[in-house]
Amino acid sequence: MRHDHLLSAKQLSRGDIEGVLDRAAEIAADPDAVAEKHSDKLLGLLFFEPSTRTKMSFDTAMKRLGGDTVDMGSVDSSSVKKGESLADTVRVIEGYTDAIVLRHPSEGSPKLASEFVDVPVINAGDGAGQHPTQTLLDMYTIRENAGLDDLTIGIMGDLKYGRTVHSLAHALTNFDVSQHFISPESLQLPRSVRYDLHESGAQVREHTDIESVLETLDVLYVTRIQRERFPDENEYRQVAGEYRIDADLLESAKDDLTVMHPLPRVSEIAADVDETEHATYFKQAHNGVPVRMALLDEML
């Protein structure tokens, strides 16, 4: 993959995706081979929203490549609290680091940041927009379990505000898959994403219940309801807990169904699913390290 920045899954071709996944598999098999490869590099971590997995896996990935990270820390302890603009912040951080990983509550912020710096900018989530590096590790996990073609994939939950969903849906258009979107009507895919999928010729179906499609699925990607994105708390309460997967429900699924979740989960996957062979979400999270190592290896 040869891009100056990674801002959206829409910029990734099939070749880009497979290249990163192949490199990640090589690194996972022999991490010592790259243990000092980027010992002269520093990665800037600018997270304007909370993060556990994404931030820690980028930190781990950079250090396992021999480099180090510079963390802006809490927004409350930075000059952002004093009113500093995003443009000024990234122009300063550019002078300290060789690449910037940015998470921000406003859609389009990584693209804006990329216009002010010459180092690579990697989108680690921009509001309800995109999360392309999550998609790469999702694709890696799907490929490990089921391949990437001739699949029926269900994506369930908050499709309106879920940025991981938007990125994954775009990336899957590069492959021979049928996508089924399961959500309340109020949380269906945004019109812009639907338009992109239609223009790509993707096989897409929308549902309001999981039971009608579960037995056909090879992969079920579950997401939480994005409470922090709702403009009205009452709107959130109307849909919270409406879609839930448990072991009893999965009795009607294929034996080899892969159940995924970008995490954190709230109540949308019951704890009893953890003990089934379907559960893949913790391994999915762990895959973030080799995938982000591969991405950094190609972009630095």
Swiss-Prot record:
Q: Which residues bind carbamoyl phosphate?
A: R53, T54, R103, H131, Q134, L263, P264
Q: List positions binding L-aspartate.
A: K82, R163, R224
Supply the alphabetized keyword list. Answer: Pyrimidine biosynthesis, Transferase
Q: Which InterPro entries match?
A: Asp/Orn_carbamoyltranf_P-bd (IPR006132), Asp/Orn_carbamoylTrfase (IPR006130), Asp/Orn_carbamoylTrfase_sf (IPR036901), Asp_carbamoyltransf (IPR002082), Asp_carbamoyltransf_Asp/Orn-bd (IPR006131)
Question: What does the entry give for GO biological process?
Answer: 'de novo' pyrimidine nucleobase biosynthetic process; 'de novo' UMP biosynthetic process; amino acid metabolic process
| Xref: SUPFAM superfamilies | Aspartate/ornithine carbamoyltransferase
Q: In which pathway does it act?
A: Pyrimidine metabolism; UMP biosynthesis via de novo pathway; (S)-dihydroorotate from bicarbonate: step 2/3
- EC assignment: the record states 2.1.3.2
Q: Which GO terms describe its molecular function?
A: amino acid binding; aspartate carbamoyltransferase activity
Catalytic reaction equation(s) = carbamoyl phosphate + L-aspartate = N-carbamoyl-L-aspartate + phosphate + H(+)
Q: What does this protein do?
A: Catalyzes the condensation of carbamoyl phosphate and aspartate to form carbamoyl aspartate and inorganic phosphate, the committed step in the de novo pyrimidine nucleotide biosynthesis pathway.
**What does the record note on quaternary structure?**
Heterooligomer of catalytic and regulatory chains.
Database matches in NCBIfam families: asp_carb_tr, PRK00856.1
Q: Which family does it belong to?
A: Belongs to the aspartate/ornithine carbamoyltransferase superfamily. ATCase family.
Instruction: Quote the PANTHER family the UniProt record gives.
Output: ASPARTATE CARBAMOYLTRANSFERASE (PTHR45753:SF6), ORNITHINE CARBAMOYLTRANSFERASE, MITOCHONDRIAL (PTHR45753)
Tell me which HAMAP family the record gives.
Asp_carb_tr
The identity of this protein, by name, is Aspartate carbamoyltransferase catalytic subunit
From the broadest rank down, the organism's phylogenetic lineage runs: Archaea, Methanobacteriati, Methanobacteriota, Stenosarchaea group, Halobacteria
Q: What's the gene?
A: pyrB
